[in-house]
A protein has these predicted regions:
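Extracytoplasmic
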Residues: 1-3, 9-71
Length: 71
């Protein structure tokens, strides 16, 4: 199981691409995942929840709303 930090979920790919661009421009290792008819913008694939929590805090400090998800 992996922990990922999600910063957004969009029906329109353009909106997801815009958030992904902002993340990567700020140095975050973001990626796009299409799942359940949504484009999800996520960061990381952490084996330890503590690492995901640390990344989540960095993203929140940068102004993103976040949620930790598992895969």
């Amino acid at each position: 199981m992996y922990y990922r930090v999600q910063t957004g979920a969009f029906r329109r790919r353009e909106n997801a691409d815009q958030m992904l661009y902002q993340l990567t421009d700020q140095g975050f290792p973001g990626f796009l995942l299409y799942e359940n008819n949504l484009y999800k913008v996520q960061v990381g694939a952490f084996q330890q929840i503590n690492n995901a929590i640390q990344m989540e805090q960095k993203l929140r400090d940068a102004g993103y709303s976040t949620i930790i998800v598992t895969k």
